[in-house]
Amino acid sequence: LQYGEYTADTARETSISGKTLEDGTKENRSYKGVTAHEVPNYGDLEALQYANENAGDVPVIVSMKMERGMVWDEVEPLADVILVNYNVQREDIVAEVILGQTEPTGLLVFQQPINMEAVEAQQEDVPRDMECYTDAAGNTYDFAFGLNWSGKIDDDRTAKYSAEPISKVQSFDYAAYEAANK
C-alpha cells in the first residue's frame, strides 16, 4: 500500500477473521506491531523524487498500475499528473491519454486510503468505510472518483456508484431479489 517502511501500531489486537483451529479456538491474524519494510520497487519512488527535483518546468506524469488501493501521500505531492490503470488497459491508450489524444474516462474501483492508520481502522466486512486521501487540488480519492479534461467526472456511472456507504446491517429479501431479476 505504500513504499516506505511502516509499523502497524494501530492495528487491531485480535483480527476479525481467522480459521477455526483444531482445538476449537479462532486463529488470530492480527498484524499489530508488525513492520513492513520498503517494498521491492522502492526505486520507483526514488526515481519519482529525482524527476520531481530535476524536471524544472516539465510536468511529472505518473502512470500507476494498481491491483489494490495505495497510500498516495508519498507520490501525489511529487506528480503533476497521475494516471491510474489496472493492468487491463492497452499501453498505447495510456500513451494517447498522456499525449492528449484520448480523454480519460476511468473511475477508481476502490477507495484510496488517507494513510495506513485508515487502513487499520477499516472494518473488513463494511464496504467503503475508509477515510480517503485528498490531494492538493481538493480531490478525494474515493470509490468511483475520476477526472477528465473538464474536471471531476459526474455522469451516470458516478451517480450509480457514488451511493453512501453501508454503515449498518441491512436486511436482504433474496426471494424479492430473485423475483425482480427473472
Model-predicted regions and their roles:
Residues L1-K182:
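C-terminal non-catalytic regions of proteins with extracellular/luminal or membrane-system context
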